[in-house]
């Protein structure tokens, strides 16, 4: 099956919305972000939204191209890099972000909130 361009564009739109919100938070001082649980929770949520969109795009491409099922979200980005769909450096950055996303979602009590800023 061909790649669903509309689905990819829709996911990119959601990623862009979440990134624009994160950029607004970036203007705030670190103390405000880290010190306010509501703000910190919003930052974490929008980071997860960005990563979920990236992961969905990644898995859609891997599935449609029949390149197999990666063992982890991070491995999916590495595979896209190996297939030259995205630059290797971007693949590595996205893989690291996917690992951080997993930490946020599954081991949230271990997250160093300073890393979010």
What are these regions (language model features)?
Residues 1-117:
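Solvent-exposed interaction patches of small proteins and small membrane subunits
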């Amino acid at each position: 099956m061909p790649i669903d361009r509309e689905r990819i564009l829709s996911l990119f739109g959601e990623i862009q919305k979440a990134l624009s919100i994160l950029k607004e938070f970036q203007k705030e001082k670190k103390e405000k972000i880290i010190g306010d649980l509501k703000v910190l929770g919003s930052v974490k949520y929008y980071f997860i939204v960005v990563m979920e969109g990236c992961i969905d795009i990644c898995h859609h491409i891997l599935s449609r191209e029949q390149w197999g099922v990666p063992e982890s979200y991070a491995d999916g980005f590495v595979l896209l890099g190996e297939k030259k769909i995205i630059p290797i450096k971007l693949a590595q950055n996205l893989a690291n972000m996917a690992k951080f996303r997993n930490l946020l979602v599954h081991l949230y009590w271990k997250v160093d909130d300073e890393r979010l800023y």
